[in-house]
Amino acid sequence: MNTDNRYHWPHKDLLDVTQLSRADTLHLLDLAASFQEINSRPVKKVPTLKGKTVVLFFVENSTRTKTSFDVAGKRLSADTFALGKSGSSLNKGESLKDTALTLQAMSPDVIVMRHSSSGAARYVADLLPCGVVNGGDGWHAHPTQALLDCFSLREAWANSFEGRTLLILGDIAHSRVARSNIHLLTSLGVRIRVCAPRTLLPAGVDHWPVEVYTDLRQAVRDVDAVMCLRLQLERQQAGLLPDLAEYSRRFCLGLEHMALARPGAGVLHPGPMNRGLEISDDMADAPASLVLDQVAAGVATRMAVLYLLATRNDGGRA
């Protein structure tokens, strides 16, 4: 493990990848790579954040992100505890402000927060002196998901982003994962394509730094990787999709599609997967699938995030 003390981390919070410079991103990825080594040891724990406290404040349901942050904190020897809406006074009508101030009175070093309202994490970060990590806010942003995806792609692409092409496939309009990945990866020189039914493309997408497709076979041709997005089934109920079977026929990623991509192209998915709808069984289980690599990358990347925020005021540099 190498926590290079020459780089000054300038951010109290991690709310959106838009706040990160290219140097910030590359430093964080390098730090995550050093933490990745810990996860392969027989004893997967170091005392780096001993005495620090991390609160997992998840007002919106989460399994992967919350568990990943919990494991990340524990592997750095931080004390972690989780609080959801049902276990907080929010369920009794308390305001978000009062709940946040109550948590701050317990002197946490970092609060990781997920909320269904866009901007909620920034609101809390502006209130509190401790570090705040946005674990996902509405349709707005999911910075650590984008960072772990970036980490996974960097490993798959032998540390080279320039000249690579990524296809993001699925519900672009309602995806905070897509928004965060598009900004982060284009800042590193990756070309982005998006593919979805017109009803699942956001307004103004033609002005985004992406190529837009509605035909999967055209979109996947010669790409270096594909990122499938989870289709939220309530979109059909909202009338945005005429029929799930039709969506699957046109937009479910299969082995036949990846045969059109560049040799060695990988497939990512933030999870949970709807097999047979967004991605075929054969594709999900193929050697090209990077889904489990993403899970491992998530722990290492979130270890890096917690380390940078929890130690920022300790007098050293990260």
UniProtKB/Swiss-Prot annotation:
Q: Known catalysed reaction(s)?
A: carbamoyl phosphate + L-aspartate = N-carbamoyl-L-aspartate + phosphate + H(+)
Broad enzyme group: transferase
Q: Which UniProt keywords apply?
A: Pyrimidine biosynthesis, Transferase
Name the InterPro entries for this protein. Answer: Asp/Orn_carbamoyltranf_P-bd, Asp/Orn_carbamoylTrfase, Asp/Orn_carbamoylTrfase_sf, Asp_carbamoyltransf, Asp_carbamoyltransf_Asp/Orn-bd
Q: What is its EC number?
A: 2.1.3.2
| GO CC annotation terms, alphabetical | cytosol
In this chain, L-aspartate is annotated as bound at K92, R176, R230
Q: Does the keyword Transferase apply?
A: yes
Sections of the chain in a coiled coil: none
Q: Which GO terms describe its molecular function?
A: amino acid binding; aspartate carbamoyltransferase activity
Q: Where carbamoyl phosphate is bound, by residue?
A: R64, T65, R114, H142, Q145, G271, P272
Q: Is Signal there in the keyword field?
A: no
Q: Name one GO biological process term.
A: amino acid metabolic process
Superkingdom of the organism of origin: Bacteria
Pathway where it operates? Pyrimidine metabolism; UMP biosynthesis via de novo pathway; (S)-dihydroorotate from bicarbonate: step 2/3
What NCBIfam families has UniProt attached to this entry?
A: asp_carb_tr, PRK00856.1
As for what it does, the entry says: Catalyzes the condensation of carbamoyl phosphate and aspartate to form carbamoyl aspartate and inorganic phosphate, the committed step in the de novo pyrimidine nucleotide biosynthesis pathway.
Q: How does it assemble?
A: Heterododecamer (2C3:3R2) of six catalytic PyrB chains organized as two trimers (C3), and six regulatory PyrI chains organized as three dimers (R2).
Family (UniProt): Belongs to the aspartate/ornithine carbamoyltransferase superfamily. ATCase family.
Protein name (Swiss-Prot/TrEMBL):
Aspartate carbamoyltransferase catalytic subunit
Q: Which organism is it from?
A: Desulfovibrio desulfuricans (strain ATCC 27774 / DSM 6949 / MB)
